[in-house]
Every structure is written in C-alpha cells, then in structure tokens.
Amino acid sequence: RAADDAVLSLHLADAESVRALAGACLGHNDCVLYVIAAGYMGVSRMTPGVREYTDSIRCRPAVYASAEELPLAGVQVMMASGNVSRAVAAIRGGGLALDYVSSDPGVIDITPRGVGKWSALLELCRMEGIPPENVAAAGNYLNDRDMIEHAGIGIAVGNALTEIKALADIVLQHDCEHDAIAELVDKLLAM
C-alpha cells in the first residue's frame, strides 16, 4: 500500500489452494491458520496465544469452522502457527499454488506462489524506475532473506538470526524497537 492507503499491487491466493490448506489445518488443535483478505481476518481456532497476538495488532478475527466460511476468492496472505508442519505438508504434498517461509519460531507466512517481500520490492522498483541495486532492505528473519541477499544494501537489525547477519552488507547493533533507524542513518552518513 502507498502512503495514501492506495493498493499498488495485489496478488491473490488461488481459491482451491486456500480451501485445501484450510481443510488440512481445521480440526487439529495443534495448528492455527490465519487467513487475511480485504476487510477480513479469520483464524481456524482461538487460543490464548492467538488472542494475545490479535490484541497486539488491534484486530478481532472471525473464527471459521469450515473453508466455505472464508472469502476464498480474495485471500491475500495466510499465516500458520503452532504445528506448522501440518500446513507445510499440505502445501508440499498437495501441490498447492502457495509459497511459505518461516517468519518467527513456530510461525510461517503463506503467500500466493512467487509472492514475497523481495518480489514486492522488485515490483515497486519497476513501478518507480529504481534499479534494485539502488535499494536498501532491512530485516531479521528468514522471510527477509531474499531482500537482504539481493538488495543493493542488505541490512540486518540487531536481533536478526545469525544466518541473516551473515548475508547482510550492514549489521546493526540495535533492533527495530530500539533505535535501529537512527543507527542506520549514522552508518549510511559515515559511508
């Protein structure tokens, strides 16, 4: 989204892939599937951890009991937490048109095939006529890997995984909650 909240680009998940993934996760108490579409956030079950997370982002998700309750034709992104191996097995074994990447311990982001942070950054670069080598990208986890690896300047914040820090051109001491931007500006001005 742009600063004015306009949607710059939208890639929706394949409805049958969403249906299959939701079906694989529903009815199992060890995996929660979050489904996000325009104006909609749903979860396969409510747990104290889900409540804590959704409270932190000021959201009250719907709790869906079947895939038919989902806006199947408009799903933008999904996330699984808990026993994510159930979701991974469904994606891999079912030939679903979805990609996944770990975004936190015990959490995976699930996107339409070919869609991720780096592909989104490349699309924005094309829209604005900016060569990707003139872009900086920062992150801390596996879902940031492609961006950090391929951007002109890859930046790992202080709480980044060791393997993410190893890929970065710049490694910050601070994380995003504690002055990473100020530290980055100082480092860039010193270059």
Give residue ranges: language-model regions.
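Short glycine-/acidic-enriched loop or helix-start segments at secondary-structure transitions
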Residues: 3, 44-46, 87, 147, ...
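Short glycine-enriched loop/turn motifs at secondary-structure junctions
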Residues: 3-5, 69-71, 103-104, 149, ...
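Glycine/small-residue-rich loop that forms an oxyanion/phosphate-binding "nest" at active or ligand-binding sites
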Residues: 3-19
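Short, glycine/charged-enriched secondary-structure capping and boundary segments
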Residues: 6, 47-51, 90-93, 151-153, ...
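Catalytic cores of large soluble enzymes that bind and process phosphate-bearing ligands
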Residues: 9, 13, 79, 173
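Short, flexible loop segments at the rims of nucleotide/cofactor-binding pockets, characterized by
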Residues: 10-11, 54, 149
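Conserved acidic, metal-coordinating active-site core of Asp-based
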Residues: 18-20, 24, 28-138, 142-145
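Mg2+-dependent phosphoryl-transfer enzymes with acidic/Ser/Thr/Gly-rich catalytic loops
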Residues: 109-191
